[in-house]
C-alpha cells in the first residue's frame, strides 16, 4: 500500500544524514531553476502575457505595409501607425468589429498642489475602455460621446498604480482638478487594478481623451490630417468573425479610402498606384503592442535557451551526486531487496527524495529569481517602454517554477533510481563485505556520460558567452560618426507647460547660448531627436528633378537642429555650409542632408542648391550642406537617409541639448539643471546623461545578454568541474587495489598520475568535441544577435575550449594526485 507520508519521512531522514550532499544539490538546483524562472518572468512580461482585458483573443492590431505619405511616428514601427481620419473611417464604416479603439503614448507635465512632475500616459479614443472591457475601480471611464468635439472634455483617468503611489489611494481625488500641460483636467475615474494600457512593458499613469490632442500637444493639429501617421489602432472582432475574414473585409473597405486619400493629396499617377497597393493586415492583438519587442524577443529566446542548458547541467550534476549516493547506499538497497522489498517501492522512495530535493531547489530558485530579476532591471533603460517590467513573481511565474521543479526532480531522479535498484544481490553483498565500493562499472560509465554532457553543455555556454562579449565589444567600439567623449545631454519639453512656438524658440536659443558660455563647456547645441535614443521621426519627400523609381521608398529620417550642432557633435561637414543664426523663421527655407541621402538621390552630382518638398509644405527647401553619415537611432543600424532642418524654421515640441565639456561631463549635471531653472523654475528637465551612458542604455539588451551569458558560462563550468572531480574521485576509490598492485609491481607516481589523467583527458575531449560540433551546427540561431563576429569564430571557440580544458585538468588533477599517494600495502590488504 502506498504511504506518501512514510516516503516523505524516509526522504527527509536520508537528506538530513547527508548534509553536504543536500546543500550541494539544493544550490545546484536553486541556481538552475532560479535562472530559468527569472528569464521566464522577463519573457512572460515582454512576449507571452495577454492583456488583462475581456476576451483578449478577440483583439487584433492594425498594421499596413507599403509606401506611406507624410510624417510618421515610428515609436512602434511605421507599419503600426495610422492617421486619425483613417481610424475614424475604419471605426464608422466597418461591419466586422464590435468596436475599434485608438491610442497614442504621450508625456505630460502634471501639477497638483504646487508640485510639478513629468508623467507618462495615453491619449485614447472615447470607446477605449469599453472596447477593451476594462472597468473603473472607482468613478467611471470615458464615453464615445466624449470623442466628438476637440477640446470639449478636459477629463483624465488615473491608473490604479499611479493613484496609489501619487495620491495615496485617496478616493477623494475623484472630481478633483489637476493640471496637465497647463490645462485644468478633472479626474473622473481610476482604472481597474492591474491594467497598464495596451503597450507591452509600459505603465501609463494617466489616460486622456483623444479629442484633447491639441490642448495636450500645442501646434499638433493632426486630428484632421490624413498624412500624419501617429495612432495605433486595435479592434475587437465580432463573435464568429475570424481574423482572416476581418482582414479581407477591411481591405475591401479600405481600397476606396486609399483612392480618395490619394486623390485629395494630389498624387501623381505613378505614386497613386503605389499608394493604393498598400495592404492592411490584422495581427493578433491580445498581447498588446511593443516598441521593444523586435529588439528583445530574439535576445530573450537566446537567454531562455542558455538557462535551459544551465538547468540540464545542474540536473546532470545532481544526477551524478545521486548515483554516488546510491553507490554508498548499495548495501542498504541490496539488503532491502533481499528481504522482499519490491523494486517499484524502492524506485518510488528514491523519486520522492529527488522530488523533495527539486522542490527545495525550486523554493531556493524563487529567491535566486527575485535577486536575478532585480539585477535584470538595472540593465533596462529608464524610459516608458520598460516602466511596467517587474521583478516580482506573479501566479504564472510561480506555476512555472513549480512545474519546472517537478519536471526537474523526475528528470535527474529517474535514471539514478533505476540504476540503484538494478543490482546483483550476491555480488553486491560480497563486494561490500570485502570493502569494494558499490556501483560497479555501470555506475561509473553512467557518471562519465553525465560528466561528458556537462562538459559539452558548459563549453557551448562558454562559446556563447565569448561571442556575445565580442559582439558587445564591437558595438561599444563602433564608429558612431560623432565624438562620444566629453559629451553630456539633457532634454526639455516646454510645450507641456503651455509654451507657444515663438516662446519655445526664444527659450531654446537662450539655453543654447547660455550653456555654451558656462565654465567647463566648450560648445553647445541641440536637436529635436535624441541621438541613439531609439526615436525615429520620418517623413516622405519629393525632390525637384528626381524621378522616383517604381516602389522606391521616399521616406527619410528628419531632425530639427540648432546652429553648431554638427560642430558640437564632431560630425564633419563634407560640402556646403552649416546652419547659422541667420537661418531663422523669415529666412529662405534650408536643409542639410547626409552623404547617404546625397549618394542615393544624386549619385556623383552636386546636391548643393537642389530643392526638396515634404509633407504639405508648398514651399521647397534648398540643400545648403552635406554632412558625414552617423548612427542616429541605434548603433546597429545601417546609415539612414537623413535630412536636417533649422529648428527656427520648424514646428518643435521638445529639444535635446548637447554640451561638449572640457572636464568629466557628469560633474556638469547640476550646473545644467541650475541653468534651466534660471530660465524657468517650473520646466522639468529629463534624460540628463553622458553620451557614454546613453550608449550603454541603448545597448541594454546586448549588455544584459553578455553579462548573463558570462555568468551562466562561469556557473556551468564550475558545475562541470565539480562533476568531473566527483567522477574521478569515485574512479580512484574504485581502482584503489588496482593502483596498489601497479605500485607494488614498480609503477612510480608519475605513471599513476598519467593513468588517471588519461581518463580526465578522455572525458574532456569527448565533451569538447560534442560541444564544438553542436556549436558549429547551431551558430546560425544566434548570428542575428551578433555584430561583426561570426557565430563560428575560431578565436572565440579556441579561447573557450582552452578555458574549459584547463578547468577540467585542474578538476581531475586533485583525484589523480590522491591516487599517487595510495599505500600499496593498505590497498592489497583484502587480497
What name fits each language-model region?
Residues 31-65, 372-381, 457-486, 729, ...:
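Alpha-helical transmembrane segments
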Residues 51-107, 229-232, 264, 475, ...:
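Membrane-proximal extracellular/periplasmic loop immediately following the first transmembrane helix
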Residues 121-144, 153-298, 374-378, 464, ...:
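Mid-to-C-terminal secondary-structure elements
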Residues 1-21, 53, 115-116, 149-151, ...:
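Membrane-helix entry/capping segments
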Residues 39, 319, 355-428, 470, ...:
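Small-residue-rich transmembrane alpha-helices
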Residues 1-22, 288-292, 321-348, 352, ...:
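Alpha-helical transmembrane segments of integral membrane proteins
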Residues 18-46, 50, 313-315, 358-362, ...:
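Short, strongly hydrophobic transmembrane alpha-helices
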Residues 314-358, 436-437, 722-764, 768, ...:
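Interfacial "coupling" helices/loops that link adjacent transmembrane helices in transporter permeases
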Amino acid at each position: 500500500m502506498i504511504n506518501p507520508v512514510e516516503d516523505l519521512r524516509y526522504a527527509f531522514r536520508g537528506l538530513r544524514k547527508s548534509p553536504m550532499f543536500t546543500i550541494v544539490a539544493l544550490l545546484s538546483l536553486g541556481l538552475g531553476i532560479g535562472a530559468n524562472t527569472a528569464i521566464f518572468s522577463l519573457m512572460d512580461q515582454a512576449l507571452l502575457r495577454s492583456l488583462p482585458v475581456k476576451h483578449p483573443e478577440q483583439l487584433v492590431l492594425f498594421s499596413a505595409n507599403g509606401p506611406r505619405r507624410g510624417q510618421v511616428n515610428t515609436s512602434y514601427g511605421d507599419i503600426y501607425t495610422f492617421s486619425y481620419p483613417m481610424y475614424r473611417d475604419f471605426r464608422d464604416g466597418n461591419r466586422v468589429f464590435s468596436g475599434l479603439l485608438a491610442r497614442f503614448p504621450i508625456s505630460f507635465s502634471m501639477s497638483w498642489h504646487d508640485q510639478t512632475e513629468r508623467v507618462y500616459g495615453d491619449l485614447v479614443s472615447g470607446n477605449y475602455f469599453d472596447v477593451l472591457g476594462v472597468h473603473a475601480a472607482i468613478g467611471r471611464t470615458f464615453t464615445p460621446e466624449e470623442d466628438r468635439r476637440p477640446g470639449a472634455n478636459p477629463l483624465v483617468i488615473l491608473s490604479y498604480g499611479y493613484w496609489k503611489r501619487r495620491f495615496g489611494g485617496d478616493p477623494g481625488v475623484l472630481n478633483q482638478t489637476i493640471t496637465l500641460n497647463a490645462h485644468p483636467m478633472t479626474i473622473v475615474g481610476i482604472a481597474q487594478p492591474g491594467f497598464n494600457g495596451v503597450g507591452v512593458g509600459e505603465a501609463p499613469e494617466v489616460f486622456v481623451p483623444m479629442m484633447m490632442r491639441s490642448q495636450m500637444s500645442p501646434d499638433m493639429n493632426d486630428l484632421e490630417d490624413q498624412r500624419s501617421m501617429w495612432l495605433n489602432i486595435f479592434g475587437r472582432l465580432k463573435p464568429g468573425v475570424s481574423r482572416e475574414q476581418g482582414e479581407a473585409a477591411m481591405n475591401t473597405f479600405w481600397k476606396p479610402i486609399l483612392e480618395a486619400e490619394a486623390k485629395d493629396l494630389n498624387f501623381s499617377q505613378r505614386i497613386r498606384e503605389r499608394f493604393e497597393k498598400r495592404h492592411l493586415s490584422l495581427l493578433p492583438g491580445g498581447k498588446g503592442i511593443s516598441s521593444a519587442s523586435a529588439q528583445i524577443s530574439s535576445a530573450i529566446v537566446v537567454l531562455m535557451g542558455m538557462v535551459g542548458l544551465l538547468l540540464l547541467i545542474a540536473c546532470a550534476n545532481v544526477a551524478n551526486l545521486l548515483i554516488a549516493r546510491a553507490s554508498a547506499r548499495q548495501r542498504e538497497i541490496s539488503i532491502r531487496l533481499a528481504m522482499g522489498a519490491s523494486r517499484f517501492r524502492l524506485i518510488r522512495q528514491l523519486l520522492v527524495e529527488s522530488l523533495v530535493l527539486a522542490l527545495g531547489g525550486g523554493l531556493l530558485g524563487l529567491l535566486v529569481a527575485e535577486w536575478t530579476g532585480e539585477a535584470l532591471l538595472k540593465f533596462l533603460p529608464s524610459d516608458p517602454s520598460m516602466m511596467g517590467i517587474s521583478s516580482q513573481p506573479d501566479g504564472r511565474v510561480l506555476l512555472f517554477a513549480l512545474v519546472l521543479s517537478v519536471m526537474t526532480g523526475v528528470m535527474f531522479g529517474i535514471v539514478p533510481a533505476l540504476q540503484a535498484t538494478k543490482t546483483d544481490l550476491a555480488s553486491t553483498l560480497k563486494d561490500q563485505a570485502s570493502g569494494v565500493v558499490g556501483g560497479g562499472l555501470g555506475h561509473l560509465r553512467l557518471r562519465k556520460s553525465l560528466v561528458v554532457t556537462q562538459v559539452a553543455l558548459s563549453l557551448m555556454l562558454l562559446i556563447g558567452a565569448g561571442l556575445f562579449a565580442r559582439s558587445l565589444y564591437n558595438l561599444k567600439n563602433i564608429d558612431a560618426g560623432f565624438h562620444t567623449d566629453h559629451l553630456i545631454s539633457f532634454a526639455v519639453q516646454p510645450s507641456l507647460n503651455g509654451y507657444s512656438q515663438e516662446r519655445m524658440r526664444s527659450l531654446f536659443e537662450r539655453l543654447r547660448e547660455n550653456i555654451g558660455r558656462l565654465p567647463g563647456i566648450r560648445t553647445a547645441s541641440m536637436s529635436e531627436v535624441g541621438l541613439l535614443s531609439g526615436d525615429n521621426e520620418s517623413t516622405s519627400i519629393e525632390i525637384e528633378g528626381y524621378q522616383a523609381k517604381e516602389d522606391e521608398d521616399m521616406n527619410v529620417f528628419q531632425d530639427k537642429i540648432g546652429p553648431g550642432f554638427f560642430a558640437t557633435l564632431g560630425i564633419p561637414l563634407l560640402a556646403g555650409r552649416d546652419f547659422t543664426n541667420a537661418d531663422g523663421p523669415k529666412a529662405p527655407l534650408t536643409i542639410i542632408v547626409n552623404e547617404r541621402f546625397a549618394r542615393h538621390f544624386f549619385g556623383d552630382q552636386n546636391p548643393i542648391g537642389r530643392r526638396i518638398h515634404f509633407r504639405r509644405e508648398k514651399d521647397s527647401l534648398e540643400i545648403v550642406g552635406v554632412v558625414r553619415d552617423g548612427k542616429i537611432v541605434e548603433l546597429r543600424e545601417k546609415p539612414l537617409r537623413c535630412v536636417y532642418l533649422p529648428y527656427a524654421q520648424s514646428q518643435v515640441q521638445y529639444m535635446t541639448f548637447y554640451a561638449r565639456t572640457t572636464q568629466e561631463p557628469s560633474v556638469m549635471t547640476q550646473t545644467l539643471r541650475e541653468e534651466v531653472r534660471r530660465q524657468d523654475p517650473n520646466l522639468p528637465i529629463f534624460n540628463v546623461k553622458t553620451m557614454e551612458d546613453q550608449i550603454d542604455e541603448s545597448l541594454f539588451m546586448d549588455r544584459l545578454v553578455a553579462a548573463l551569458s558570462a555568468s551562466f558560462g562561469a556557473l556551468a563550468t564550475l558545475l562541470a568541474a565539480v562533476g568531473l572531480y566527483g567522477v574521478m574521485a569515485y574512479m580512484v576509490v574504485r581502482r584503489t587495489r588496482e593502483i596498489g598492485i601497479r605500485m607494488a609491481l614498480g609503477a612510480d607516481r608519475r605513471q599513476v598520475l598519467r593513468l588517471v589523467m588519461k581518463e580526465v583527458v578522455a572525458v574532456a575531449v569527448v565533451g569538447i568535441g560534442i560541444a564544438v560540433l553542436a556549436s558549429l551546427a547551431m551558430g546560425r540561431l544566434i548570428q542575428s544577435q551578433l555584430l561583426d563576429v561570426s557565430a563560428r569564430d575560431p578565436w572565440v571557440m579556441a579561447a573557450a575550449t582552452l578555458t574549459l580544458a584547463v578547468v577540467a585538468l585542474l578538476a581531475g588533477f586533485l583525484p589523480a594526485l590522491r591516487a599517487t599517494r595510495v599505500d600499496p600495502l593498505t590497498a592489497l590488504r583484502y587480497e
